[in-house]
Amino acid sequence: DSIIHHLQYLNAGFLAMDPSSGALRAWVGGIDHDFYQFDHVNSNTKRQVGSIFKPIVAAMALERGVSPCSLISASRPTYTDKEGVEWTPRNTQNDYQVEYTMRGTLAYSVNTVSAKLIQLAGVQPTISLARAMGIKSDMPEVPSIALGASSISLIEMTTVFACFANHGVAISPYYIRSIHDNDGKVFDNFKSEEPSKRVLSEETSELMISMLKGVVNEGTAGRLRYMYGVYNDIAGKTGTTQSNADGWFMAMTPNLVIGTWVGADDPRIRFRRTDLGQGSSTALPITAAFFKQVNKDESFKSITDAKFPKLTTDLQGRLDCDLYELSEDLIVEIEKSIFQRDSLIQADTSVKPPETFLQTIYKRKLKIRATQERKDSIASALEILEGG
């Protein structure tokens, strides 16, 4: 009974890294090293990474010339690998009729579109990029790696996101900065053993940072803002494995990159529902608590107040699109479903069916349209006043 009891404990790994140097600022291998002597950070501890692998796919697609504003259908593709095994990805939401841009694909973590992006980017080039960015673990040459089917360590994935924050220059982490005595006499200084190397264009890195900020501001990591009140300039990506065994959240600021993993020591132990086991519910709150703590400390102002550089006009233009588009036929279907839902609520106020994902993104579109119409009306009124 005792073994079963402790196997069900959730564990966690947490790592903070300086993206420009690779210096490690914080390392938490688990919840209690005296009892659970297992380090969930180091390179020997590998877990399926889920959707935190998707930014690597998107970056490779950008490098291959795919526009971040290109619309890609969320319909379900079927792929056959070299062994003849078929694979058909699916989404957590019933959104297969929606067309997503790369921005929306990352913000809403759309599996089917990510699977299509790796076909445009190339599976082997994507693996090569992942290796160049810092992943040394095995990655099978199959399309499903786009959704994080590979098992990779937390320190490797944090190194990957450090590459994005470091403008596309890959670094390797190091643990000890210097050795000195109590009087301050320095005996030795250390730095990363491997030289830094550019593996992504600066443009691609800046586009990726902007799109991953969208994940935090209006995507799957949105609760970092509205639930936990963390408003630092943060780009990030949530991740959840298919079996709900692993929850991830990767967060980037200009001067600090943070990787967080949550799960049981035994990957066979998992959450029964995705809403319980997803990275935004398990790993993200730990990152939020960290930021809320360091935000109180004046000595960390260089980290907490740092802002990512603004995009150039050209790069802003390349991202001048919405997250998704809805066809007229789909809009009609959504409007019917909203009418039916509202009618049910009016008929029985004790019954309030939850709003579907499609209804939510449709209403978002309406708000955007209304805001734009107000802006246009104000602009027209000002023109009339100036002309008069």
PLM region descriptions:
Residues 86-91, 122-161, 168, 172-175:
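Mid-domain, small-residue-enriched loop/turn segments at the edges of structured enzyme/sensor domains
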Residues 66-126, 170, 182-207, 213:
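Conserved catalytic neighborhood of penicillin-recognizing serine enzymes
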Residues 21-22, 46-74, 105, 160-164, ...:
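Active-site SXXK
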Residues 1-52, 66-70, 124-130, 142, ...:
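Periplasmic/cell-envelope proteins involved in peptidoglycan metabolism and beta-lactam response
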Residues 27, 31, 59, 63-65, ...:
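Structured segments of extracytoplasmic/periplasmic soluble domains
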Residues 316-388:
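Low-complexity, Gly/Ser/Thr/Pro-rich intrinsically disordered linker/tail segments
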Residues 1-18, 27, 34-43, 53, ...:
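A penicillin-recognizing enzyme superfamily signal
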Residues 7-20, 24, 59, 63, ...:
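C-terminal substrate/ligand-recognition segments
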